Amino acid sequence: KSLSIGPSVFLNLVDDILMWLKFSSGIKGSFWMSKSALGNRNGLQISLYGDKGSANWIQTEPEILKLFSNDGTCTILDRGGRTKVCGSPRYNRYKAGHPAGFLEAFANLYSDIADAFIQFDEAGAHQNPYVFGFDHSVKGLNLFAAACKSNEYGSWEELKPVVF
């Protein structure tokens, strides 16, 4: 079973999902999405685990990325540091420690969309990796449809390739 749907206080509304994934590469993953987990305050958290280390980012501490190596070392990267991405002007409209994030994320997205429109107008296609199109949206819906089917039958469900 690759999906667990929890109870809701509202009829016919899914507001708590735990999804397990197995990729063809052998990597395993999980998603927990909930609108009913009291106290989390839309607490987006992304964690990646591997055999050489792990990384953790938490929405409530948006300026910090924690890296953990298999020798026990913990490295903390912050927005004010001299890292390749964190130090980019795109992510530093304000100095480290000043509130930033939500509005800036949308500003970056709108800027990326505008650039993609210009590229598309000039070349008939765009190369911006941050602007998704119809095919990406359909693949995401396909994932959730397979998860619902998995929940219904109580077994793993293979994602079918999406052909455009």
Task: Name the predicted role of every residue range.
Residues 149-164:
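C-terminal capping/lid region of NAD(P)-dependent oxidoreductase domains
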Residues 138-149:
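C-terminal hydrophobic helical "lid"/dimerization subdomain
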Residues 35-37, 61, 163:
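A short beta-strand motif that forms part of the nucleic acid-binding face
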Residues 32-36, 49-52, 132, 160:
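Glycine-rich Rossmann NAD(P)(H)-binding loop
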